[in-house]
A protein has these predicted regions:
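Hydrophobic alpha-helical membrane segments
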Residues: 1-293
Length: 293
């Protein structure tokens, strides 16, 4: 029954993350800005590529793909770092400050750029492997992609909260995942299912209108797009909040505010309110490791 226990923990994380977002809706501003900035970057990049080379060859496409992955990863990571800093403020009982979150991300712009560059190279390698249609290549690409995602799951909170070098930040992310894999899997699954439910709920009014009044198809389509975008925005924000809570749990001696009552150790909801974090798993870690001021 461990699967259902993890799933209960995941839904508990999703509920508590929703409470955080409900009490502090301004947190959604950061993923929204990230989405707009990312779209503008992609549009500008491809505009330049096709303006300079109307029929780009493979070397040009590889460079363009590197630039695409690099810029997209940096933008997403920068605003995610700001979101996580703000989420941590709410866990400390303070009012989140978007300005302070952006400043915290700005202080770590070097590591974020390095992370984006490494991620871009890995992304292009995976993409090149995927272009081989053979089954072994597809399997290698899939395994490589999953392993990379697991290894770097906590890379952004490590960057924003810890003073570590390039190699160490990957080691710290891996260590945190290794010691909280069950909780991380449950939280990701719970928030993912909630996001799917939000997408369905967001698209439903437009779908109903489309079938009820086909003549208003354009309006119905607009409602569907807006509903799905808002649901995706909420899902991204909830993911950032839940991941920050997991990270704080892994590095502090207390369960984050809003997440009291979740028995992390048993992966259930409503057990021992103070599980004591993972300070026992991280020897000598009282509070966030190497906390940045």
């Amino acid at each position: 029954m461990r699967f259902f226990s993890r799933l209960r923990t995941g839904f508990a994380f999703a509920r508590r993350s929703t409470r955080v977002l409900r009490d502090h809706p301004r947190l959604a501003v950061l993923p929204a800005v990230a989405g707009v900035a990312g779209l503008l970057y992609v549009a500008a990049l491809w505009g330049v590529v096709f303006a300079v080379t109307p029929s780009p060859d493979q070397p040009v496409m590889v460079v363009a793909l590197l630039a695409l992955y690099f810029g997209s990863t940096f933008i997403a990571s920068y605003f995610t770092a700001a979101l996580m800093f703000c989420a941590k403020q709410t866990f400390d009982g303070a009012e989140p400050s978007i300005r302070e979150g952006l400043r915290a991300a700005g202080r770590n712009i070097g590591p974020l750029l390095a992370w984006a560059a490494i991620s871009a190279v890995v992304g292009v390698i995976i993409r090149m492997i995927e272009e081989n249609d053979s089954l072994p290549a597809q399997l290698v690409a899939a395994v490589f992609s999953v392993a990379w995602g697991v290894l770097t799951y906590f890379i952004v909170p490590v960057i924003v909260f810890e003073d570590v070098g390039l190699t160490e930040m990957f080691a710290r992310s891996k260590q945190t995942v290794t010691r909280t894999w069950g909780e991380s899997l449950g939280a990701a699954g719970g928030v993912g299912l909630v996001t799917v439910a939000l997408v369905i709920a967001g698209a439903l009014p437009g779908i109903v209108l489309l079938f009820a009044l086909p003549s208003l198809g354009l309006l119905a389509f607009a409602l569907i797009v807006v509903g799905v975008l808002l649901a995706g925005l909420a899902g991204q924000t909830l993911t950032g909040i839940a991941k920050t809570a997991l990270y704080v749990y892994a590095t502090e001696d207390e369960t984050p505010e809003y997440f009291d009552g979740i028995d992390f150790g048993d992966s259930g909801d409503g057990g021992s309110g103070g599980s004591g974090g993972l300070s026992g798993r991280f020897p000598g870690s009282g509070g966030i490791v190497g906390r940045k001021s």
